[in-house]
């Protein structure tokens, strides 16, 4: 695991954006595209802001999927698609056909999960291998749409529906699974502020308990893992 630490949120976000730009360039050089799964969370807004300001990203080569989604309209404030579109996708020249929403209002979440698998596997293989999965962590070490004791944690499918997820905002979700985290070429976990110290200690330091600590799925990663934190959180975790 590589720790990306900077003095404050803005600098840490800029550092994350720089590494994403590097990963994008390397993937495009190697495979002609950059495949990424993005999460919609306020914690990621400064990262998206820093990323969209960069001039060295070949946006037209990006293939965008989502790491998780709530069963809401894309106009709903809780929509991951809406959040990422507002803070990144609508502000950069990514082709609409290259952006794949995870859920459409009126669709059953179980059907949405099944429907999301085919385009992902067709483009990225089985299991799908993303160049990057970008996400954050919840207060109980939740990642993506995966909460403690969630059945999807042991799924052999890359995408699952989660009914009545207790992760705020509560409700049905569609999510990638640990299978995808394990196979990805790179994972980037972003967290700012000492309030995340407890959750990250559970992820990084506690004994293995993947079903009760979903974030521990990153321990099985076959690719690179980047932990992006600000100085306040780094000190709380004794990383500085």
Feature names for model-found ranges:
Residues 49-59, 82, 86, 148-157, ...:
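A glycine- and small-aliphatic-rich helix-loop capping segment at beta-alpha/alpha-beta transitions
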Residues 28-53:
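Glycine-rich N-terminal segment of FAD-binding domains in flavoprotein oxidoreductases
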Residues 59-134:
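Ligand-binding beta-strand-loop-alpha-helix segment within the catalytic cores
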Residues 38-43, 135-139, 192:
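Glycine-rich beta-strand-to-loop/alpha-helix junction loops that act as flexible
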Residues 1-36:
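N-terminal glycine-/serine-/threonine-rich phosphate-binding loop
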Residues 132-179:
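Class I SAM-dependent methyltransferase SAM-binding "motif I" and its flanking Rossmann-like core
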Residues 111-113, 143-149, 199-203, 239:
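A short secondary-structure junction signal
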Residues 185-240:
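ATP/nucleoside-binding phosphotransfer catalytic cores, i.e., glycine-rich phosphate-binding loops
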């Amino acid at each position: 695991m590589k720790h990306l630490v900077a003095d404050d949120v803005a600098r840490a976000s800029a550092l994350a954006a720089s590494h994403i730009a590097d990963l994008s360039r390397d993937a495009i050089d190697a495979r002609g595209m950059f495949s990424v799964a993005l999460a919609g969370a306020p914690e990621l807004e400064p990262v998206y802001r820093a990323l969209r300001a960069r001039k060295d990203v070949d946006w037209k080569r990006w293939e965008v999927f989502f790491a998780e989604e709530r069963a809401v309209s894309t106009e709903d404030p809780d929509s991951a698609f809406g959040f990422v579109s507002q803070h990144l996708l609508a502000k950069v020249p990514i082709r609409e056909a290259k952006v794949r929403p995870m859920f459409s209002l009126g669709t059953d979440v179980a059907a949405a999960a099944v429907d999301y698998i085919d385009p992902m596997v067709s483009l990225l293989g089985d299991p799908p291998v993303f160049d990057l999965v970008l996400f954050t962590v919840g207060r109980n070490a939740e990642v993506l749409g995966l909460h403690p004791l969630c059945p999807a944690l042991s799924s052999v499918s890359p995408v699952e529906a989660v009914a009545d997820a207790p992760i705020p905002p509560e409700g049905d979700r569609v999510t990638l699974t640990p299978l995808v985290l394990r196979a990805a070429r790179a994972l980037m976990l972003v967290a700012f502020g000492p309030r995340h110290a407890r959750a990250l200690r559970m992820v990084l330091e506690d004994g293995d308990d993947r079903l009760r600590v979903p974030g521990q799925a990153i321990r099985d990663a076959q690719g690179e893992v980047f932990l992006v934190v600000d100085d306040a959180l780094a000190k709380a975790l004794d990383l500085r």
